[in-house]
């Protein structure tokens, strides 16, 4: 299952990915690659948020890739990975994935 494999790939970077840390940056780079594979245009804003967009997006979905020490492997990353998977399965729909 691709969703679980991707969650494990992010978790393998580090269990704890503090905001603005090298570990969170690595998770963003991994997610950016998956967004491109899903046909999304990837960008970052000045605050460091990662966006994958297609078309005139009116629906935004996603979550966060940083975590706290005791949050567990699904904290934040599940929402990001699920949103990327939805984008991959809906190639003709305008949407945005936010991480």
Task: Please tell me what each predicted stretch does.
Residues 3, 24-28, 76:
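Generic structural signal for well-ordered, non-membrane alpha-helical segments
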Residues 1-21:
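N-terminal capping segment at the start of a domain
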Residues 10-13, 52-54, 86-91:
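Alpha-helix C-terminal capping segments
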Residues 15-16, 66-68:
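A short, flexible beta-alpha/helix-coil linker loop
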Residues 61-64, 70-99:
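Alpha-helical metal-binding/catalytic segments enriched in His/Glu/Asp
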Residues 16-55:
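A non-catalytic alpha/beta surface segment that caps or lines the substrate-entry region
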Residues 56-60:
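Active-site beta-strand-loop-beta-strand hairpin of nuclease catalytic cores
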């Amino acid at each position: 299952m691709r969703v679980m494999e991707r969650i494990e790939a992010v978790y393998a970077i580090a269990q704890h990915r503090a905001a603005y840390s090298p570990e969170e940056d690595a998770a963003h780079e991994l997610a950016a690659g998956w967004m491109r594979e899903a046909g999304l245009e990837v960008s970052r804003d000045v605050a460091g948020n990662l966006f994958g967009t297609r078309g005139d997006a009116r629906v935004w979905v996603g979550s966060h890739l940083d975590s706290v020490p005791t949050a567990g492997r699904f904290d934040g990353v599940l929402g990001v990975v699920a949103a990327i998977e939805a984008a991959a399965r809906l190639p003709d729909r305008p949407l945005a994935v936010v991480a």
